[in-house]
Amino acid sequence: PFFPAMTDDQIETYTQISVSPDCNEAVIARAKELGLEPVPGVFTPTEAFAAIRAGATHLKLFPAEAASPLTVKAWRAVLPKHVSLYAVGGVTPANMQGWVDAGVAGFGIGSNIYKQGATAATVAKAAKEFITAWRALKS
């Protein structure tokens, strides 16, 4: 959600998380009030710490492709250990290992699985490639 009122709409979908594109402290606060886990988008340490001060314990590094696993490694050195960081944007099965090695807890994946006009078979194939890569990382 981009605005606190949009967070209210998520309750009707029975969601447990509230993913947003930026570090909007009002959205984080409203998500917490509603019992949702906020996952704000951040790109700088300043944004990350603002989100943490507002109550977020999960952060979406976006767009991750404009940063790097080295960025994550540096952030992990200063972020509280209880804060999870997720790479979103530009993640591929081939680069997941580097992100995990640097300290991400997981990924948000969209356009590398689904593109407008894609067939169900194409989407399924792409999703399976990510699942296979993730399972290989966890074994």
Predicted feature locations:
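Glycine-rich beta-strand-to-loop/alpha-helix junction loops that act as flexible
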Residues: 1, 86-91, 107-111
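Catalytic beta/alpha-barrel core
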Residues: 1-3, 9, 15-23, 36-48, ...
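Catalytic cores of alpha/beta
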Residues: 8-12, 47-54, 91-107
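Glycine-rich phosphate-binding active-site loops on the catalytic face of alpha/beta enzymes
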Residues: 22-27, 60-68, 103-126
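C-terminal helical cap(s) of enzyme catalytic domains, especially alpha/beta-barrels
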Residues: 31-32, 116-139
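Short beta-strand/loop segments at the ligand-binding rim of alpha/beta enzyme cores
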Residues: 31-39, 78-87
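Catalytic alpha/beta core domains of metabolic enzymes, predominantly
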Residues: 43, 52-58, 72, 84, ...
